[in-house]
Amino acid sequence: MKKNLMLIFGGVSFEHEISCKSAYSIYLALLDLNKYNIYPVYIDKCTGVWYLLDSVSDPPKPINTDVLPIVSLLPGFGIFSNNKNLEIDVVFPVVHGRTGEDGAIQGVLKVMDIPCVGAGIIGSAISSNKYFCKLLLKSFDIPLVPFIGFRQHDYFLDKEEIKRNVKEVLGYPVIVKPAVLGSSIGINVAYSENQIESFIKEALKYDLTIVIEKFIEAREIECSIIGNEKMKIFSPGEVVVQDFIFYDYDAKYSVIPGNSIIFNIPAHLETNQLLSIKEYAFLTYKNLELRGMARVDFFVEKKSGTIYLNEINTIPGFTDISMFAKMCSNDGLQFKDLVDNLIDYAFQSYINRKKRIDFEN
C-alpha cells in the first residue's frame, strides 16, 4: 500500500523560486518511484498560506492560488484540505531559507507527530544561523575563517568600535553577510573601510545579526552527506567560478554566456585534504545532531592549502544545477534512489524517537 507523502515548497523566503525548482525535480523522482501518493503543498510567497496542488509544474510557470484549496493543520487530528483529512504519513519539506531550514517547519511537524525528511529542530536552527553555528563549531575545533559577529542593536550603540574591530581583528578585504539566509543572498566584499558601513546596512535589510569574515582567495569545495546515526559521506566536488568574485546568488542562478561556472566532481584534492574535508564534514554532521541530509561547504585557501569550513545547508538545492545530488550521483546513487533513501531516513528517525517517548509502555 502506498504511503501518503506531502511535498512542501515555496515559502515566505528570498529563495522561494529556488524552492519551486527543487520541488519540481523531487516531484518527478517521486512519480518515477511510484511508491507514494503525492500531495504537493505550495506556500504562498506573500501571505504564507498553504495550498494543495494536483501536481508540481515546471517553474517558472505561475501558480494561481485563487482556485486552490487551503491546507489546515490541526495538532492531534491531522492535516486537512476541503474538510478531508489527508492522512499524511511523511512530509518532504523543500522550503529553502526562513521557515524551511531554520527549524520552523520541523517544529510544526513535530507537534503534528508526522515524520519529516531532513534535519530536526535543533540541527536546522543552529545550521541556519551562520554566527551561532560558527561559535558552536569553533568549540569543536573545526577550522573556520577568522570572523566577528554582532546584532543590529550593538552596531547602532557603537558603530566605530565594530568598524575598528573589523580593521584590527580581520583586516581588509572582508565579506559581510546576514547571519540567516542561504544562496549567498545579501553578501558583499568590502575592500576598504569606506565600503564597510554601506555593506553592513545592506546586510541588515535581510537579518538583525551580521557576520563579517576575512576574505581569502580560496577554492570552494562542497560535500554531500546522507543518513542518521550511520551516515554516508560522498566524494566532494568543487565549484569553479569564472565571472564572479565568489559563488553568490547571481553566480548560482543567473544565465551567463560562455558557461561561467564549472563543476568538478570529484574535486581535485590532495589525499590529506580529501581526508580532512570528510573528517570535518563528519564531525559537523555529528556535533550539530543533523540527520537525513546536509551539504557541508568548505574553503581551501589557494596559497596555503588550508581548509576552512564555510557553512552547512540542511535542505540543499535539488535543481538541475545543484551540487548535492550531483555528488551523490557521481558515487553511484541516482537521483530517484537518493530521494527514496531520504524518505526512509525520515521514517527511521521518527521510529527511533517514538521508542524514546512511548508513554504507554
From Swiss-Prot:
<dbReference type="GO" id="GO:0046872">
    <property type="term" value="F:metal ion binding"/>
</dbReference>
<dbReference type="Pfam" id="PF07478">
    <property type="entry name" value="Dala_Dala_lig_C"/>
</dbReference>
<comment type="function">
    <text>Cell wall formation.</text>
</comment>
<keyword id="KW-0133">Cell shape</keyword>
<dbReference type="GO" id="GO:0071555">
    <property type="term" value="P:cell wall organization"/>
</dbReference>
<feature type="binding site">
    <location>
        <position position="311"/>
    </location>
    <ligand>
        <name>Mg(2+) 1</name>
    </ligand>
</feature>
<keyword id="KW-0547">Nucleotide-binding</keyword>
<dbReference type="InterPro" id="IPR011127">
    <property type="entry name" value="Dala_Dala_lig_N"/>
</dbReference>
<keyword id="KW-0961">Cell wall biogenesis/degradation</keyword>
<keyword id="KW-0436">Ligase</keyword>
<feature type="domain" description="ATP-grasp">
    <location>
        <begin position="134"/>
        <end position="344"/>
    </location>
</feature>
<feature type="binding site">
    <location>
        <position position="297"/>
    </location>
    <ligand>
        <name>Mg(2+) 1</name>
    </ligand>
</feature>
<dbReference type="GO" id="GO:0008360">
    <property type="term" value="P:regulation of cell shape"/>
</dbReference>
<dbReference type="GO" id="GO:0005829">
    <property type="term" value="C:cytosol"/>
</dbReference>
<keyword id="KW-0067">ATP-binding</keyword>
<feature type="binding site">
    <location>
        <position position="311"/>
    </location>
    <ligand>
        <name>Mg(2+) 2</name>
    </ligand>
</feature>
<dbReference type="InterPro" id="IPR013815">
    <property type="entry name" value="ATP_grasp_subdomain_1"/>
</dbReference>
<dbReference type="InterPro" id="IPR011761">
    <property type="entry name" value="ATP-grasp"/>
</dbReference>
<dbReference type="GO" id="GO:0005524">
    <property type="term" value="F:ATP binding"/>
</dbReference>
<keyword id="KW-0464">Manganese</keyword>
<dbReference type="Pfam" id="PF01820">
    <property type="entry name" value="Dala_Dala_lig_N"/>
</dbReference>
<feature type="binding site">
    <location>
        <position position="313"/>
    </location>
    <ligand>
        <name>Mg(2+) 2</name>
    </ligand>
</feature>
<keyword id="KW-0963">Cytoplasm</keyword>
<comment type="pathway">
    <text>Cell wall biogenesis; peptidoglycan biosynthesis.</text>
</comment>
<keyword id="KW-0479">Metal-binding</keyword>
<dbReference type="InterPro" id="IPR005905">
    <property type="entry name" value="D_ala_D_ala"/>
</dbReference>
<dbReference type="InterPro" id="IPR000291">
    <property type="entry name" value="D-Ala_lig_Van_CS"/>
</dbReference>
<comment type="similarity">
    <text>Belongs to the D-alanine--D-alanine ligase family.</text>
</comment>
<dbReference type="InterPro" id="IPR016185">
    <property type="entry name" value="PreATP-grasp_dom_sf"/>
</dbReference>
<keyword id="KW-0573">Peptidoglycan synthesis</keyword>
<dbReference type="GO" id="GO:0008716">
    <property type="term" value="F:D-alanine-D-alanine ligase activity"/>
</dbReference>
<protein>
    <recommendedName>
        <fullName>D-alanine--D-alanine ligase</fullName>
        <ecNumber>6.3.2.4</ecNumber>
    </recommendedName>
</protein>
<feature type="binding site">
    <location>
        <begin position="167"/>
        <end position="222"/>
    </location>
    <ligand>
        <name>ATP</name>
    </ligand>
</feature>
<keyword id="KW-0460">Magnesium</keyword>
<dbReference type="GO" id="GO:0009252">
    <property type="term" value="P:peptidoglycan biosynthetic process"/>
</dbReference>
<dbReference type="InterPro" id="IPR011095">
    <property type="entry name" value="Dala_Dala_lig_C"/>
</dbReference>
